[in-house]
């Protein structure tokens, strides 16, 4: 994000001198520039952040422990602990829509558009997700209007659906993707079938959806095991 938030200005005291400044409106407070040591004059520093701007850091800095989830990052543990939590049983799909990813960023205003579009078809949002915590009305997906213009590296709309609802959700995402001023990727979480197949593959192939080879797998090493 460093290259995308730089702004060049003339020094008002020495007009022949051009200085580099950070566009505070575009900065998502990810702290990558600080950790990278990219400034040769060591001019970068972390200002004190107040609410609602502190939300940018909570959602963007992977080393910042989010106060709502008490884990680093902007999401939940989702399938990574499913063998113990049992959040994703057979017959259900967990879905996560990562607004602003990869590398573009998003404002909560766009996250709200996606959430509200899904709420119209009866989607309920994951209770422990940090974005859900910002909703003032979870039945409609409406987010606190005071934070809508805050920009973050990404924000995740997370929910659980029955398998048969996937085509309808994809229809909604096709529509709302043309209404937001950012990009997003979709994640689907499910138990692999007993024959080793993935239950949603055929649905996505029929729609010519790109499926990344990258993913997360839970191999069931936790204890005690949940009945899923």
Name every feature range the model reports, one short phrase each.
Residues 105-110, 163-172:
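Short, conserved charged micro-motifs
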Residues 110-140:
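Short amphipathic alpha-helix segments
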């Amino acid at each position: 994000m460093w290259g995308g938030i730089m702004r060049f200005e003339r020094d008002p005291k020495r007009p022949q001198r051009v200085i580099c400044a950070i566009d505070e409106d575009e900065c998502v407070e990810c702290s990558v520039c600080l950790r990278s040591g990219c400034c040769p004059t060591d001019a970068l520093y972390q200002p004190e952040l107040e609410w609602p701007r502190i939300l940018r850091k909570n959602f963007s800095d992977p080393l910042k422990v989010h106060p709502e989830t008490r884990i680093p990052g902007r999401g939940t543990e989702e399938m990574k602990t499913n063998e113990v939590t049992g959040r994703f049983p057979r017959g259900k799909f967990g879905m996560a829509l990562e607004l602003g990813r990869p590398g573009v960023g998003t404002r909560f205003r766009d996250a709200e558009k996606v959430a509200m579009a899904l709420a119209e078809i009866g989607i309920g949002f994951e209770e422990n997700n940090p974005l859900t915590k910002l909703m003032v009305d979870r039945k409609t997906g409406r987010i606190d209007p005071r934070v809508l213009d805050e920009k973050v590296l990404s924000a995740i709309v997370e929910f659980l659906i029955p398998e048969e609802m996937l085509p309808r959700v994809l229809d909604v995402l096709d529509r709302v993707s043309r209404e937001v001023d950012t990009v997003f990727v979709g994640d689907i979480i499910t138990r692999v079938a007993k024959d080793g197949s993935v239950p949603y593959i055929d649905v996505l192939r029929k729609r010519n959806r790109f499926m990344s080879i990258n993913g997360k797998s839970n191999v069931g090493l936790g204890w005690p095991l949940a009945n899923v």
